[in-house]
Amino acid sequence: MEHKHHGKSSAKFLDSEEILSDLNLKGDETFLDAGCGDGYISKKAIEKYLPNGKVYAVDSYPESVNDLKNFIAENSLDNLIAIEADITEGIFEVDDGSVDVVFMLNVFHGFKQSNQREDVINEFKRIIKSDGKIAIMEFKPVEMDWGPPIDIRISHAELEKIFGDYGLKKTYLNVDIGKDIGETKSHYLIIFEKE
């Protein structure tokens, strides 16, 4: 079974403030929201967390990117840039070593299924600064009534191994973030940096 998630938003069940505050942004970083969907994380980042920063909102879904471009124009934002791109093929508008934080929410599991992890990780390594961070937030691989099929979810331990194979080390892990599901939360957030 192929899992498609293009254009879906996590805004209804994940709090952008909880997520962004966990990233400890200073306010002047360059931030890339990979697979941004409707851009709710990007919009909140510019509004509250990166007043002197720059945000690239990247998605392969044209409708999402066009909606974001309209939002940018309506609000005269020059530090939010919407880019239509397939991360596996490269984000050509973003220079090598220019991003402080790459953030990906509920997207990496799709590359587990499509076997394009290597392309994604190498692109992230290309665009982050030498001290840059890659933050991945994903559904925990546990049964819940929503989210991707459990067989394509990926654990934080799996991610740590995968990213480690590419010379990236885990520097932060929060296993208690997202929507309440019983005695735990729906997601985890893991951050990697170059070794």
Regions found by a protein language model. Name each.
Residues 147-166:
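Conserved Class I S-adenosyl-L-methionine
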Residues 118-130:
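A short glycine-rich, Lys/Arg-flanked "PGG" loop and its adjoining helix->strand segment in the class I
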Residues 131-138:
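Conserved beta-strand signature within the Rossmann-like core of class I S-adenosyl-L-methionine
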Residues 92-102:
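A short acidic, Gly/Pro-enriched loop at the edge of an enzyme's catalytic core
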Residues 100-115:
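A short SAM/SAH-binding and catalytic strip from SAM-dependent methyltransferases
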Residues 176-195:
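Core SAM-dependent methyltransferase catalytic element
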Residues 32, 37-90:
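Class I SAM-dependent methyltransferase SAM/SAH-binding core
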Residues 10-29, 44:
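Conserved alpha-helix/loop element of class I SAM-dependent methyltransferases that forms part
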